[in-house]
């Protein structure tokens, strides 16, 4: 089996016991299986939930708190307990772990996004196993975000993973809720996530988790768009993750391999960047960009909206108002208003620029 880069996401329901604490038995089972992946020569990253579930009983809550301050306090206590438990278990296999706590803003800010990429790359090069969680104690997103499902998809794209394994307490995707319908049909393989499939998923999560099947399907769709195939399911024992790679996992495989990888810069533009303005373009420029993969030139620009700087991300729309994509602009809004509609030779005569693309195709994402 060739060396692969694998992201494994383990949800709260797969970690916590019935009283809300960390189940040592379940955690040990997961760690043993992750260690087997490493033993097989694969690079492994772990996205783990469970900080709130691990911490609420230590603070005296009889059950998972429902207030934001209660959840965040529980997460602050639980994250250290969770990491300590992982570190002790992985040490038995001689595996060095590293903790990364991320928030949505770490993805939306280009410099922090690049730093996360560089840090993860160095950790993997050093054979460490990164353990990643949302920074629950200061971030609201995780508490309504889907139990780290989307975080796992975004990280898998960031590191160009070969596969994302989302482990939960349900053995895959069904056309109906299998707990309520005996005739529910299981999907063993889905080539893509269609609107029909997405509509079948419910929002309800498990008792100790926040992410239902809908969040997992949304995460799978995002991962596929970033070139990462997905497995959603469950399992026990040391071989469960290796079995997934062999096609023997107890769940649903999503996506045909190999997927087309999206470069890091385009991932940031597509999924994380903040749009600072809009550019309207004519029909000729639309055809050149969409059908022929060309860069956007000033000659095709008909209107500029907003106030943006060089390097900011802008939306691009047709004269009919349809948004076709977005990208990093090489001109400020003020500069672009002065040269919109001008041919490159006329801009050259002004002597102001040596590169004349408004948005280079390497910094463009179609929507």
Swiss-Prot record:
Ligand binding (substrate): 49, 136, 148
EC number: 2.7.2.11
Keyword Nucleotide-binding: yes
InterPro entries associated with the record: AceGlu_kinase-like_sf, Asp/Glu/Uridylate_kinase, G5K_ProB, Glu/AcGlu_kinase, Glu_5kinase, Glu_5kinase/COase_Synthase, Glutamate_5-kinase_CS, PUA
GO CC field: cytosol
GO molecular function terms listed in the Swiss-Prot or TrEMBL record: ATP binding; glutamate 5-kinase activity; RNA binding
Localization (cell): Cytoplasm
Keywords, alphabetical: Amino-acid biosynthesis, ATP-binding, Cytoplasm, Kinase, Nucleotide-binding, Proline biosynthesis, Transferase
Origin: domain of life: Bacteria
Pathway assigned to this chain's UniProt record: Amino-acid biosynthesis; L-proline biosynthesis; L-glutamate 5-semialdehyde from L-glutamate: step 1/2
Annotated GO biological process: L-proline biosynthetic process
Presence of the UniProt keyword Lipid biosynthesis in the record: no
Residues bound to ATP: 9, 168-169, 210-216
Enzyme class: transferase
Family designation: Belongs to the glutamate 5-kinase family.
PANTHER family: GLUTAMATE 5-KINASE, ISOPENTENYL PHOSPHATE KINASE
Function in brief: Catalyzes the transfer of a phosphate group to glutamate to form L-glutamate 5-phosphate.
Name of the protein this chain belongs to: Glutamate 5-kinase
UniProt source species: Bacillus cereus (strain Q1)
Gene this chain is encoded by: proB
């Amino acid at each position: 089996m060739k060396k692969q880069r694998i992201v494994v996401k383990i949800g709260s329901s797969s970690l916590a016991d019935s009283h809300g604490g960390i189940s040592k038995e379940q955690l040990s089972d997961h760690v043993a299986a992750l260690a087997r992946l490493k033993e097989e020569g694969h690079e492994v990253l772990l996205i783990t939930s469970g900080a709130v579930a691990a911490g609420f009983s230590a603070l005296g809550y009889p059950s998972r708190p429902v207030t934001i301050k209660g959840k965040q306090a529980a997460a602050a206590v639980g994250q250290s307990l969770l990491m300590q438990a992982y570190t002790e278990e992985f040490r038995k296999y001689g595996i060095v772990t590293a903790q990364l706590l991320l928030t949505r803003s770490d993805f939306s800010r280009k410099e922090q996004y690049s730093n996360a990429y560089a840090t993860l790359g160095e950790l993997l090069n050093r054979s460490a196993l990164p353990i990643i969680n949302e920074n629950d104690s200061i971030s609201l997103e995780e508490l309504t975000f889907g139990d780290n499902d989307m975080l796992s998809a975004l990280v898998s794209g960031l590191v160009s993973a070969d596969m994302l394994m989302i482990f939960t307490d349900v053995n895959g995707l069904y056309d109906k809720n299998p707990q309520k319908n005996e005739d529910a049909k299981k999907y063993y393989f889905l080539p893509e996530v269609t609107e029909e499939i997405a509509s079948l998923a419910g929002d309800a999560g498990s008792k100790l988790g926040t992410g239902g099947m809908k969040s997992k399907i949304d995460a799978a769709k995002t991962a596929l768009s970033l070139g990462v195939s997905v497995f959603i399911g469950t399992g026990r024992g040391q071989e469960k993750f290796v079995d997934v790679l062999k096609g023997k996992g107890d769940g649903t495989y999503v996506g045909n391999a190999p997927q087309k990888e999206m470069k890091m810069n385009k991932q940031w533009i597509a999924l994380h960047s903040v749009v600072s303005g809009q550019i309207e373009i004519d029909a000729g420029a639309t055809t050149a960009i969409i059908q022929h993969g060309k860069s956007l030139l000033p000659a095709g620009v008909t209107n500029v909206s907003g106030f943006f700087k060089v390097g900011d991300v802008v939306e691009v729309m047709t004269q009919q108002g349809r948004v076709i994509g977005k990208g990093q602009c090489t001109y400020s809004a003020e500069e672009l208003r002065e040269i919109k509609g001008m041919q490159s030779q006329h801009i050259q005569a002004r002597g102001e620029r040596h590169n004349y693309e408004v948005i280079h195709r390497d910094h463009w994402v179609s929507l």
